[in-house]
Amino acid sequence: ANPMAMNTWAANEIGKVNTIGLCHGVQGGAKLIEDSLNIPFNKMKYSCSGINHMTWYLDLKYKGKKITKEQLSKSLKKHKKFSRDEKVRIDVLDKFGYFSTESNGHLSEYLPWYRRTQKDVKKWSSLSNWIHGETGGYLRVCNEKRNWFLEDYSKYLKKSGINLNDYKRSTEHGSYIIEAIETGKKYRGHFNVINKKTISNLDEDCVIESTGYVSSKGLQMIEGIKLPLQCAALCSTSIDVQRMAVKAAVNGDVELLKLAVLQDPLVSSVCSSEEVWQMVDEMLVAQEKWLPQFKSKINSIKRNLKKIKNYKYSKAVKGITRKTKNNRQKRSVLVEKEAFNL
């Protein structure tokens, strides 16, 4: 799943670089809630805490009134688009009592219940957009945009006079953080940082995503937040995977890496321990040139793989996907707009 937490964790703990991870899931999820309830943009008050791609809207209010789980669930199920595209998020809301900031597809990557079989994937995913659970959707979209960039970007730059006034400021954190630091204007956002005292019922050394304020004095996180028990339990499972993965990557520890993959909720829902061991070996060999810390181990892995003949994995879970569009097809759907998310 997403490496945000692991990268932020490694940069802070191992690299000793003061690093803050930024994601746009909170803003996107808030707009989705506003749209489902017909609330004007940016008029809902909310607070979120958790881990990246599993952050929870702990409090939702509009005009001073609390938005309940029942209200939100009902509005999402009635909405033509969201009822089709957000089935995992709605199911988690109904069962756990809180709405997740993350998209339907990404949330399903952190849980063991929604991608076990092809039937599951078809039931809980949508092909309306890659973000809603399409198998390999991110790879497809990246390939399409890369192909467009290589062929058409130079032509795009030659267009005369791109007027920046035509574009509205996005909800991405970057420009607001710079504005806050340079002008002192306080900015409230949700940031990925080492937990410490921010969320009281998650480990202090892990990376969390929670509410903070940026000003000319820097970033100040709100401390003492306590997640609902059920939400903390889901987060803790992924935190353990992230901790093992970070230490395995930094130390070149193959065995710990395999245990991290084995512990992953989605992997463990479809793979046996033998399959995980074999899969990680094959992945290490395939990506050898980018993994110098594993070099001494990879040589012995190669020898072991040569000894294994006709290893059979369990029948693969077939997902659902769309075909990669070529450049001509992409032009017909305004690829410039899609590529730059304008």
PLM feature segments, named:
Residues 15-37:
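Acidic, His- and aromatic-enriched active-site or binding-groove loops in soluble protein domains
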Residues 7-8, 30, 280:
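Generic structural marker for isolated residues within well-ordered, non-membrane alpha-helices
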Residues 2-5, 23-28, 48-55, 195:
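Glycine-rich beta-alpha junction loops
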